[in-house]
Curated annotation (Swiss-Prot):
Protein name: DNA-directed RNA polymerase subunit beta'
Family: Belongs to the RNA polymerase beta' chain family.
The organism of origin for this protein: Campylobacter jejuni (strain RM1221)
Main EC class the enzyme belongs to: transferase
SUPFAM superfamilies reported in the protein's UniProt record: beta and beta-prime subunits of DNA dependent RNA-polymerase (SSF64484)
NCBIfam families for this protein: rpoC_TIGR
Gene designation: rpoC
Binding locations of Zn(2+) 1: 71, 73, 86, 89
Pfam family, one: RNA_pol_Rpb1_3
Length: 1517
């Protein structure tokens, strides 16, 4: 750290620039040196003369003259007397601006404490003296005494309890001790003076050493905590001058007694103004009232002391003075706030700076600016993409100075006055000059709320009549603007640099891509989509069908002469090839750039296709081509939307004819279910689920019917259908509400009402139906309002935590990365690998799994083409560089960040990626749902919720899977975890019979087979093998990884598969629940119909060892009998285009070497099995089965107490159902006593139905009980926005799950104090012990093997646990997949890198575990950078470095913990931050954006990053 010089800020000369900012405590001398005189009187101004009173709060003598260069009495008036002091009124002649900077002071008769250092936790004064805050307050407010000198005083007569230094005594104790020990040196006082003396007498160095000794001596955690608290404060004081320059007087560290105020500084009067309103009233700043109270009380105290008043009166006056000063600094912090005349609390100095209306956020971070205006916006369809229409009236005002200059320059006016008059009269010359001024001078348009950088864009103004700003239709999406009365603000950039930036970076035609996802944002919407869609449709039998035309000109002529319909299918020549197309599509082709291929335009263009087209043009052609193409597209869209004349009529809404029939059928089914419920055949929950299922499916059937009808209507030219189909407006769901039925509605509590709305909007709703539907509609509106506030707050927190992240260097040189694969949730893919890898840099070579050659080298930037190749290559996971693993000292390097999505190129140094990330995550926040879902107990009817089936071909492998056979002979899953069913294909087969051996060497795994004569070895990459915790489904994905079915030392037969590629995997319990029925055997083949997928020649192969041997004698109709059969499709160059594995029992449909097309089915499966079901289970219940044979006994299960008896009327069977609400301490349990002393216990959840009786004999795999899923599921799932902020805030969830910290075997120990004890024993002998509350539902069994990171109990996984147990990379995966699930679920695309930037900021601090020789204290949270710098310093000096562990901070805590004082203070908890910083004398090196904005310096991003090198703008010759 270089030493800094303190800049003295003089009145007339402001410093040009400064490099750092330090916050310190001011000494009384310092305060006096600032002051220009003492304020003695509480008066402000004289009400008759309106002149300030002498020595009052507005005194001109102290603070300076009211008018420029004029003394108060008027003796000296003029610039020439500058610096003269008037003899009569004592005022120095100066600029009146000095009243904003000159301070005064009040000399207090007695020292008072500064409330920030008393009341802000931890109380600094209290901590230093070792006194509790409450006691300290009693001393300061004259209610108790504090011992200054204990002498030989004792509390009791036996002299055992000694009175200590700084003990606090009440009146009685004090009188008692004074009588007995006054002569032996005992002394105690009360009030501010004694506290100041005690602080002044502190020897901080001695105290520091004493505390460090105590720290070493003690073992109790609580004591350590209090000592550390004091240590921190003491160290802060001692270190508060570390960076000051040694030769200045600033070098003295802060002294504790400076926390007490003897001289109270008085704010300059213009910062607490007093303004005369008309009617003789005054608007006055509250601070003046607070100062007046202080002065009044201080003067009164002075008088009383001169009069030698009784002690009690003086004491009271001193207490009142302390209270007055407290109110001035922070009104209402202690006791009741002082209220003004209008009964509202007065605004103290603290309140002026904090909060949204405070100085920081109101005036420093956001200011009102000159040269701006606002108006309503209207659409400007004739504008170019980079233009906006600016009303002439507005332009006249905005560009007035430019215009005046132009008028003078052209000689129309000789003086400014004359020019102004011309402008007022609006003469012709004025308009001529205005046109010239505006030409080439861009303006910025902003639409509030400014959620991301595209909310402010620059345009070239076009002067228009009227008063509304005209906006180009394509930029509406970026601004989120519509024309229903939105307003926008216009700003004029003034400096040449600003104008250049607007033209080069901010012009709307430059901002075509969204920085959040890299998708184009300027995509035609609504009318434009409809026009282009209409143009691209084809109509059978239209006029002029099947004609042949030579080109676009002929087509246009034919259209104009009405002998050809625009939708007619015609043939024509395009690029020298004959193609079949329509006239409309040729018109579209005529506006496309030449490089667009036929398959992009010769089809029906819907919104998605148009978006893809725009993206393609941008990727191939760049900005300018795209911008002009978009304009042509817009014009075409509007023109044909008008010509098409599409409109809605009630006749377009077609109700299905058999609607009534379907409804009656559904009602009949509902009645049947109701009857079986009344008979007691099904439970109430099942009845509800089934009824809702019926209505759901009825609604779906009707919707499908209706869509078919609408689609057929007018040969696909039904207006409503076109709107929905093209993606212009509306959706199938909305049409079905118009034409089929409105469907099921929800109750206010989120559950579904079982009677649906049968009517549709065309028929109209009846009163009840209308009433049911209003709740949902109104809730939607209320939600939106709340959502905006929440989303805005989240954005603010994100901005604050990420504002200092910028790209600082090209490459940090790290080889570290994070392994990524596709993100899935319950078998649905949320984000594919291709999407995740796009725009990232590889951290490791990517190996092609088929050829084993390097596909992409480390350091490759993955663009769209490369990502596509990777997606098709079958690679399932890659290692990429991320901001989290970046090793740059400050910020992030370009390689770890990857592509700047806003422009599609590698990011450049100086880019403020933190802000971009925060905006990208915050901006779509308003589109997320607000609510926490109650899954109102509806069991969905999806197949995936009751079975899993194979989508690919291969054969089955069981991993650790055990099964029971039940009475019906079915196989039932016996594992609760750590098992899986895998679908694999062979990669290596044994060439001969032998013994297998597997060994790990560095990065490789060597598999060898050996018999008496020979041995073969196969080398695999360790990275490619599926890890046990991946197979068990704890982390990562296994698709495409390798699986070794045999262990070392096993005997294997010839032609056995020993290394296999996993194609699909279903783990227990996430994909296959416990007690499911398994429908496949180990090793069984799974056959599917296989399509070729590529054109070419078929060649058949068989696997031998690890290579393929050609098999030629394969004919159509053969059935495959051998493992390891492959078919390869070779292209015309005889290269492998595609390879398929053919399982046993497949039927071959083509001969060897036959030529085929990509759509041909080359392998057929057995006719009866289309999809191979692997396992299935009860969709509505979680089943509990017996794991051993034995006898059942009940615990805590009693009819009428913890359970209800239900009698099935039809069958007369009795069953017990556990009550929903149980008395505390009651845990219904089933116990099975087996052979010997073996017993298994099952805890039952509420609503469980029991199928056995006490004392029954049962067999393994019998069903004991079922818990309805709806009951298990109705726990709230936090979703949407609350889930996102929960993750970013890193909140510890209320019902956090207990998580295993090591791999090992679970053992249950004796319960301890009503808690269950679980011990996990690892293989290496280590163990971990957990105490678990009885109320939690334990999910593991005695003797099970469990992986680190798995849940032991139910509940939510806490991010902190993931970090602690599985490390930073696992946390990275967890947070990204959880957050992406929310956003993707709402259809919002955000690139991972934005989330990574925020996560890297949440991990920017570490917790010191062992401080070594550093200046840190155990338990300190310090930023990684400070930690690294300090350790490097200690190592250079040869000391012990500190050791730290990573911690995860929520975004709020991370933002407040920023290294920059100003940035933290302007975010939240302003007073606390400033209190801490002032004591430590903290430095702010002004490295980030926020503090520079506040101080008005250039921000260090973009060219500002190189501010020191002084860049000059050069004109191009």
């Amino acid at each position: 750290m270089s030493k800094f010089k303190v800049i003295e800020i003089k009145e007339d000369a402001r410093p040009r620039d400064f490099e750092a900012f330090q916050l310190r405590l001011a000494s009384p001398e310092k305060i006096k040196s600032w002051s220009y005189g003492e304020v003695k009187k509480p008066e402000t101004i004289n009400y008759r003369t309106l002149k300030p009173e002498r020595d009052g709060l507005f005194c001109a003598k102290i603070f300076g003259p009211i008018r420029d260069y004029e003394c108060l009495c008027g003796k000296y008036k003029k610039m020439r007397f500058k610096g003269v002091k008037c003899e009569k009124c004592g005022v120095e002649v100066a600029n009146s601006k000095v009243r904003r900077s000159r301070m005064g002071h009040i000399e207090l008769v007695t020292p008072v404490a500064h409330i920030w250092y008393v009341n802000s936790l931890p109380s600094r004064i209290g901590t230093l003296l070792g006194v509790k805050m409450k006691d300290l307050e009693r001393v300061l407010y004259y209610e108790a005494y504090i011992v200054e000198n204990p002498g030989d005083a004792f509390y009791d007569n036996e002299s055992t309890k000694k009175v200590e230094y700084c003990d606090v005594l009440n009146e009685e104790q004090y009188q008692n001790l004074m009588q007995r020990y006054e002569n032996s040196g005992f002394k105690a006082r009360m009030g501010g003076e004694v506290v100041r003396d005690l602080l002044a007498n502190l020897d901080l160095v001695a105290l520091l050493n004493q505390l460090k000794e105590e720290m070493g001596a003690t073992n109790s955690e609580a004591k350590k905590k209090t000592i550390i608290k004091r240590l921190k404060v003491v160290e802060n004081f001692l270190n508060s001058n570390l960076n000051a320059n040694t030769d200045s007087d600033e070098a003295v560290p802060n002294r504790p007694e400076w926390m007490m105020i003897t001289n109270l500084p008085v704010l300059p009067p213009d910062l607490r103004p007093l303004v005369a309103l008309d009617g003789g009233k005054f608007a006055v700043s509250d601070v003046n009232d607070l100062y007046r109270r202080v002065i009044n009380r201080n003067t009164r105290l002075k008088k009383l002391m001169e009069l030698d008043a009784p002690e009690i009166i003086i004491r009271n006056e001193k207490r009142m003075l302390q209270e007055a000063v407290d109110a001035l600094f922070d009104n209402g912090r202690r006791a009741n706030a002082v209220k003004g005349a209008n009964k509202r609390p007065l605004k103290s100095l603290s309140e002026i700076i904090k909060g949204k209306q405070g100085r920081f956020r109101q005036n420093l971070l956001g200011k009102r600016v000159d040269f701006s205006g606002r108006s309503v916006i209207v659409v400007g369809p004739k504008l170019r993409m980079d233009q906006c229409g600016l009303p002439k009236k507005m332009a006249l005002e905005l560009f007035k100075p430019h215009l005046l200059a132009k008028l003078e320059e052209k000689g129309y006016a000789t003086t400014v006055k004359q020019a102004k008059k011309m402008i007022e009269n609006k003469t012709n010359e004025v308009w001529e000059c205005l046109e010239e001024v505006v030409k080439g001078h861009p303006v910025m348009l902003n639409r509030a709320p400014t959620l991301h950088k595209l909310s402010i864009q620059a345009f070239h103004p076009v002067l228009v009549e009227g008063k509304a700003i005209q906006l180009h239709p394509l930029v509406c999406a970026a601004f989120n603007a519509d024309f229903d009365g939105d307003q926008m603000a216009v700003h004029v950039p003034l400096s040449q640099e600003a104008i250049a930036e607007c033209k080069v970076l901010m012009l709307s035609s430059m901002n075509i891509l969204l920085p959040a996802s890299g998708k184009s944002v300027t995509v035609p919407s609504q009318d434009m989509v409809l026009g282009i869609y209409y143009l691209s449709l084809e109509k059978a039998g239209a006029k002029g069908s099947h004609k042949i035309c030579t080109g676009i000109d002929e087509v246009m002529m034919a259209l104009e002469s009405k002998c050809l319909d625009i939708h007619a299918s015609i043939q024509t020549m395009v690029d020298g090839r004959k193609i079949t197309t329509t006239a409309g599509r040729l018109i579209i082709k005529s506006i496309l750039p030449d490089f667009v291929p036929e398959n992009s335009w010769n089809k029906v263009l819907k919104k998605k296709d148009i978006a893809a087209l725009v993206d393609y043009v941008y990727k191939q052609g760049g900005l300018e081509i795209t911008a002009s193409f978009l304009d042509r597209l817009k014009n075409l869209g509007f023109e044909y939307a008008t010509k098409a004349g599409i409109s809605i009529s009630i006749a377009d809404i077609i109700v299905p004819n058999d609607k009534q029939k379907a409804i009656d059928e559904a009602k009949k089914q509902v009645r049947e279910i109701q009857n079986s419920y009344n008979l007691g055949l099904i439970t109430s929950g099942e009845r509800y689920n089934k009824i809702i299922d019926i209505w759901k499916s009825t609604n779906n059937v009707l919707s499908k019917e209706m869509m078919k009808l609408v689609e057929k209507d007018k040969e696909g030219f039904n207006s409503i259908y076109m709107m929905a189909d093209s993606g212009a407006r509306g959706s199938a769901a909305q049409i079905s509400q118009l034409a089929a039925m409105r469907g099921l509605m929800t109750k206010p509590d989120g559950s579904i009402i079982e009677t649906p709305i049968i009517s549709n909007f065309r028929e109209g709703l009846n009163v009840l139906e209308y009433f049911i539907s209003t709740h949902g509609a109104r809730k939607g509106l209320a939600d939106t309002a709340l959502k905006t506030a929440n989303a805005g707050y989240l954005t603010r927190k994100l901005i604050d935590v990420a504002q200092n992240v910028k790209i600082t260097i090209e490459d940090c040189g790290t080889h570290e990365g994070v392994e990524i694969n596709e993100i899935t949730a319950d078998s649905s893919i949320i984000e594919t690998l291709e999407e995740r890898i796009l725009g990232r840099v590889l951290a490791e070579d990517v190996i092609d799994p088929i050829t084993n050659s390097v596909l992409f080298a480390e350091g490759t930037l993955m663009d769209e083409e490369k990502a596509k190749i990777l997606g098709e290559s079958g690679i399932k996971s890659v290692n990429i560089r991320t901001p989290i693993t970046c090793k740059a000292k400050k910020g992030i390097c370009a390689k770890c960040y990857g592509i700047n999505l806003g422009e599609g190129k590698l990011v450049k140094p100086g880019e403020a990626v933190g802000i971009i990330s925060a905006q990208s995550i915050g901006e779509p926040g308003t589109q997320l749902t607000l609510r926490t879902f109650h899954s109102g107990g509806t069991a969905s009817t999806d197949l995936q919720d009751r079975q899993v089936s194979a989508q690919k071909e291969g054969f089955i492998r069981f991993y650790n899977l055990k099964t029971y056979k039940n009475k019906e002979g079915k196989n039932i899953v016996a594992n609760r975890r750590n098992a899986a069913v895998l679908l694999v294909e062979p990669k290596i087969k044994t060439p001969f019979k032998g013994v297998i051996n597997i060994e790990n060497i560095h990065e490789d795994v060597i598999v060898s087979i050996k018999d008496k004569k020979q041995e073969v070895k196969y080398i695999l990459r360790k990275y490619d093998l599926a890890k046990p915790n991946e197979l068990a489904g704890v982390s990562g994905s296994i698709d495409g990884k390798l699986y070794l079915p045999y262990q070392s030392g096993m005997q294997v037969e010839e032609n056995e598969s020993i290394v296999e590629v996993i194609k699909e995997g279903w783990n227990v319990p996430n994909r296959i629940p416990f007690a499911s029925e398994i429908l496949v055997e180990d090793g069984e083949p799974v056959v599917q119909n296989i399509k070729a997928g590529e054109k070419g020649t078929l060649k058949f192969y068989i696997l031998k060892g690890d290579g393929l041997d050609r098999v030629k004698n394969v004919k159509k109709g053969d059935i495959v009998k051998e493992k390891g059969f492959f078919v390869v499709i070779a292209d015309e160059n005889d290269r492998e285009a595609k390879r398929h594995y053919i399982p046993r029992e497949s039927k071959i449909e083509f001969n060897d070497s036959e030529k085929i097309d990509d759509a041909n089915t080359i392998i057929a499966s057995a006719p009866k099995k289309e999809r191979k079901v692997i396992a299935e289970w009860d969709a509505y219940n979680n089943t509990i089965i017996a794991e051993i044979d034995g006898v059942v006994s009940f615990e805590d299960i009693e009819a009428g107490y913890s359970a209800d008896e239900q009698i099935d009327e039809a069958t007369g069977k009795r069953s017990l159902v556990i009550n929903e609400y149980l008395p505390s301490g009651v845990r219904p349990t089933l116990v099975i006593a087996g052979k010997g002393d073996k017993a298994v216990r099952y805890h039952l959840e509420p609503k469980t139905v029991i199928f056995v009786h006490d004392g029954d004999k049962i067999a393994q795999a019998d069903i004991l009980a079922k818990t309805p899923k709806a009951a298990a599921k109705s726990k709230d799932i936090t979703g949407g926005l609350p889930r996102v902020s929960e993750l970013f805030e890193a909140r510890k969830p209320k019902n956090a799950a207990v998580i295993a910290e090591i791999d090992g075997v679970v053992r249950f120990d004796k319960p301890l104090r009503s808690k269950e004890r679980i011990i996990i024993q690892a293989e290496d002998g280590t163990s971990a012990e957990y105490l678990i509350d009885k109320s939690k539902h334990i999910q593991v069994r005695d003797g099970e093997f469990i992986h680190a990171g798995e849940k032991l109990t139910d509940g939510v996984v806490s991010s902190h646990d993931v970090l602690k147990i599985l490390g930073e990379k696992a946390l990275h995966y967890y947070l990204i997949s959880e957050i992406q699930q929310v956003y993707r679920g709402q259809g919002v695309v955000i690139s991972d890198k934005h989330i990574e930037v925020i996560v890297s900021q949440m991990l920017r601090q570490v917790k010191v575990v062992d401080s070594g020789h550093t200046k840190f204290i155990e338990g300190d949270l310090v930023s990684r950078r400070k930690f690294r710098e300090e350790n490097e310093r200690i190592i250079r000096m040869g000391g012990e470095p500190a050791i730290a562990e990573p911690v995860l901070l929520g975004v709020t805590r991370a933002a407040i913990g920023s290294d920059s004082v100003i940035s933290a203070a302007s975010f939240q908890e302003t007073t606390k931050v400033l209190t801490e910083a002032s004591i430590a004398g903290k430095f702010d090196y002004l490295e980030d954006l926020k503090e520079n904005v506040i101080l008005g310096r250039m921000i260090p991003v973009g060219t500002g990053l190189y501010g020191e090198q002084n860049l000059k703008l050069k004109e191009q010759e």
